[in-house]
């Protein structure tokens, strides 16, 4: 793995999951901010106001609440992501269950001030990622451990103009932290072969270096990076109520700029730096600083909610994320030298969701939904630490109201991803993945 690839993953460390470490939407984006939303595949979230969690999606929904309302819960993610392939050295690249299970907690509060104004706060996550490979994995130079977390703190307010129009605005503070490790795997053998096939292989120095590379143990830590940082952004929403049974929403979440600082080290001998080899910059075990600016993409979403019958409603969403803003990563040292400059070339991506809700009685509500996540990662830029792919959702859930004040939500989703091929460094992989998501939230209106 090159130092470019290492810092690609370090950048993503600045955009990952709140006390969680999974990305189960397109790219490294997270949707899991409520359990009621999970049960309908997050369809119509900008226009539904059945609990306080919806306000984190559209702050204009604050005006739909006439009492202070609280919601807290978590979504449990149980992924099954497997990698297969064969290294040029002949070693197997098979690895099962590379994405660990994780919890994605959430907490929301909404309070009206008067008939026109209200405010809300939430703790969620919008980005997340985690993959883990064995320390002796043959492709350890591009696999290893990627443990990335973020927490999004949101404070928002809303204004009702009249019976039809409401507007909301929110401020977001994102805290991110990361730990990334890469191991030699069989890269030493491959590098030794590359040296011997180059002009350097005809010199005594080159031959000695090739022998050193060939002797590198597979569990040698060739790269280590950790760090943390804050980033800031904003979100806004508009709600239009045609009548009490039909409403529509437009929401926006801004691009977030995060200036990431991390500590980088490698146990490789510095002599490897003189040959332009496809390995991380060697530091001989010493630690140095690396700086990187990452722009997390903006997102637009259009949502609708129609109660077509006293007991039935349909809801739907179309989200558009400007992943094309994520075109390159450039890391520099303290002295300003370029540590890497890598073209990412992500493309804009969309998410479409459709669901329905059945209001059985005053106690029971049932919901279901389907969704499709379009992957923003071009085939040539896929990575086994971010094995992204198009994904299909199938969801169901229920709410039980104990009384007019307290209720509990339960949701479950099955997510299936298509099988994809990944070309990274000297390796060729195949990846397939699926996941089960289970969530529960408790809601209380004061």
UniProtKB/Swiss-Prot annotation:
One of its GO terms (cellular component) is cell outer membrane. It comes from Shigella flexneri. The keyword Membrane applies. One of its GO terms (molecular function) is long-chain fatty acid transporting porin activity. It is a multi-pass membrane protein. It is found in: Cell outer membrane. It comes from the Bacteria. Belongs to the OmpP1/FadL family. InterPro entries: OMPP1/FadL/TodX. Residues 1-25 form the signal peptide. This is Long-chain fatty acid transport protein. Involved in translocation of long-chain fatty acids across the outer membrane. FadL may form a specific channel. The keyword S-adenosyl-L-methionine does not apply. Keywords: Cell outer membrane, Lipid transport, Membrane, Signal, Transmembrane, Transmembrane beta strand, Transport.
């Amino acid at each position: 793995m090159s130092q470019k690839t290492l810092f690609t993953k370090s950048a993503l460390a600045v955009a990952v999951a709140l006390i969680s470490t999974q990305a189960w939407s397109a790219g490294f984006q997270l949707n899991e901010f409520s359990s009621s939303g999970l049960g309908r595949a997050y369809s119509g979230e900008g226009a539904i106001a059945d609990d306080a969690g919806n306000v984190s999606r559209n702050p204009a929904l604050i005006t739909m609440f006439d009492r202070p309302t609280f919601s807290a819960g978590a979504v449990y993610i149980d992924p099954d992501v497997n990698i297969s392939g064969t290294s040029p050295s002949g070693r197997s690249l098979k690895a099962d269950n590379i994405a660990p299970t994780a919890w994605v907690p959430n907490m929301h509060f909404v309070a009206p001030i008067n008939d026109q104004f209200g405010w809300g706060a939430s703790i969620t996550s919008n980005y997340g990622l985690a993959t883990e490979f064995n320390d002796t994995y043959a492709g350890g130079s591009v696999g290893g451990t990627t443990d990335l977390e973020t927490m999004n703190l949101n404070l928002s307010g809303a204004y009702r103009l009249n019976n039809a129009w409401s507007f909301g605005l929110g401020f977001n503070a994102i805290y991110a932290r990361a730990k990334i490790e890469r191991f030699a795997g069989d890269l030493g053998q491959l590098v030794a072969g590359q040296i011997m096939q180059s002009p350097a292989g005809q010199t005594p120095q080159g031959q000695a270096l090739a022998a050193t590379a060939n002797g590198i143990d597979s569990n040698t830590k060739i790269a280590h990076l950790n760090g943390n940082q804050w980033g800031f952004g904003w979100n806004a929403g508009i709600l239009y109520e045609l009548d009490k049974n039909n409403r529509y929403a437009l929401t926006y979440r801004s691009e977030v700029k995060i200036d990431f600082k991390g500590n980088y080290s490698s146990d490789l001998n510095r002599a490897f730096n003189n040959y332009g080899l496809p390995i991380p910059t060697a530091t001989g075990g010493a630690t140095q600083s690396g700086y990187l600016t990452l722009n997390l993409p903006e997102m637009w979403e259009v949502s609708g909610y129609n109660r077509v019958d006293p007991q039935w409603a349909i809801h739907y969403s179309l989200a558009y994320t400007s992943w094309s803003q994520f075109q390159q990563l450039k890391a520099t040292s303290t002295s300003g030298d370029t540590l890497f400059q890598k073209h990412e070339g992500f493309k804009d991506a969309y998410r479409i969701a459709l669901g329905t809700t059945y209001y059985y009685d005053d106690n029971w509500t049932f919901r279901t939904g389907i969704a499709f996540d379009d992957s923003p990662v071009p085939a040539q830029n896929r990575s086994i630490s971010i094995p992204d792919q198009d994904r299909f959702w199938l969801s169901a859930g229920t709410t039980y109201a104990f009384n007019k004040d307290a209720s509990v939500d339960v949701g479950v989703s099955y997510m299936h991803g298509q099988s994809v091929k990944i070309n990274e460094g000297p390796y060729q992989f195949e990846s397939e993945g699926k996941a089960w998501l289970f969530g529960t939230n408790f809601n209380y209106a004061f």
